[in-house]
């Protein structure tokens, strides 16, 4: 009996020690972004007020950096990086819903004067959105998003190419639906049409590919990313990953291996608490959509927000009100009538560019121009803040998008 008890004690001690070691290992993987926290503290007075009680607004940034382990194969590390993907994730106060809003990287935006890595200040510019991350890092990106939306960003997470691949591999791949066969030698991507499961390398090529798929627009690329994330969320939920330590550990290890977080989300305990808070959120209430946009009048390789739809979306999120999604954006290229044209509130599909981005090479430098239309925003000294656009009367605003319960080929599960 003593032997059994002693053996049990040894197992418990060793097991606890192993668990503690693994916890500390994962916890130590996460890099803390103190620089961004310090910069946001410096400009605290210009930031929006926090949202309603218990809501969380998290900015997810996919960096295209070529530095770091596993990223050099995607190009030369020239010391700069841009936000390849940026998503504003709103978690409702009661966690009954989660809304992920993609912000186009080529969206024209008012980027404030930001602190560069060398300590100098940039000038305020009206340029494509992803220039904010290149010039002033996460702090500049957060400030740009807050000015655009009027939403206080509570936390931010940055992940690179390597981290994305590892997370996909950790769940044994993610199922996608490919409408037409893809053969893209540059992206090392060769996929047949139909449903299939993609592992890390091919999954990364699939969500990043642009000019070789469809009409070459960033809108289609974001739609693919949203469908992919919806499929990933659905797989994690349906496989019971969050409740199974043997499945959860590889995912946490992958997620933390290339993760940079603000001081409020830089521990495994904080991240786990955040994720577990969504355990009872229905997949039908996990929504993915894109900020309402259309081609920018002065350069159809760029986008601009559609008003008043964009402000109605941001107003709903600020007030923690429900946002509906229905269908996908019409991606057929059409000429732009005029910059001030806007459709029915919330439900109109943005106009696509008259010239496909595949036919015109994208600019490599930021385009600093004046906006053709203020589009529902107002000037407040040097800072541009979102006007208090009211929500449309009668029911929730609805936008093109998808939910995590949708089948990858378009039918609700």
Language-model features and meaning:
Residues 1-413:
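Non-catalytic, solvent-exposed segments at the cell envelope interface
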């Amino acid at each position: 009996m003593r032997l059994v008890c002693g053996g049990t004690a040894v197992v418990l001690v060793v097991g606890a020690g192993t668990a503690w070691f693994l916890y500390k290992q994962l916890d130590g993987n996460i890099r803390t972004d103190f620089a961004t926290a310090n910069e946001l503290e410096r400009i605290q007075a210009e930031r929006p007020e926090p949202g309603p009680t218990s809501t969380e607004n998290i900015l997810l940034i996919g960096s295209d950096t070529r530095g770091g382990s596993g990223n050099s194969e995607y190009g030369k590390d020239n010391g700069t990086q841009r936000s390849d993907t940026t998503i504003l994730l709103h978690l409702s106060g009661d966690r009954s819903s989660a809304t992920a809003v993609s912000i186009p990287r080529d969206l024209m935006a008012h980027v404030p004067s930001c602190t560069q890595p060398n300590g100098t200040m940039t000038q305020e510019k009206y340029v494509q959105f992803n220039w904010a991350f290149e010039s002033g890092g996460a702090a500049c990106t957060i400030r740009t998003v807050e000015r655009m939306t009027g939403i206080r960003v509570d936390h931010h997470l940055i992940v690179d190419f390597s981290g994305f691949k590892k997370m996909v591999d950790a769940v044994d791949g993610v199922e996608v639906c490919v409408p037409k066969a893809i053969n893209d030698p540059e992206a090392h991507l060769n996929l047949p049409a139909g449903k299939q499961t993609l592992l890390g390398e091919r999954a990364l090529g699939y969500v990043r590919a642009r000019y070789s798929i469809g009409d070459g627009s960033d809108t289609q690329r974001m739609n693919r990313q949203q469908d992919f994330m919806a499929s990933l969320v659905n797989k994690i939920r349906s496989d019971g990953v969050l409740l199974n330590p043997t499945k959860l550990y590889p995912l946490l290890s992958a997620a933390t291996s290339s993760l940079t977080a603000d001081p409020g989300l830089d521990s495994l305990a904080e991240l786990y608490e955040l994720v577990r808070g969504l355990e009872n959120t229905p997949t039908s209430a996990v929504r993915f959509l894109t900020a309402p946009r259309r081609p920018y009048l002065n350069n159809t390789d760029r986008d601009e927000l559609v008003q008043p739809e964009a402000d109605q979306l941001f107003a709903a999120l600020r007030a923690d009100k429900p946002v509906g999604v229905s269908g996908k954006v019409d991606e057929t290229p059409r000429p732009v009538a005029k910059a001030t044209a806007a459709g029915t509130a919330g439900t109109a599909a943005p106009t696509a560019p008259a010239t496909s981005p595949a036919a015109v090479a994208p600019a490599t430098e930021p385009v600093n121009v004046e906006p053709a239309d203020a589009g529902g925003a107002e000037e407040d000294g040097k800072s541009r803040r979102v006007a208090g656009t009211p929500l449309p009367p009668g029911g929730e605003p609805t936008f093109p998008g998808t939910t995590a319960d949708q089948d990858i080929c378009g039918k609700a599960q």
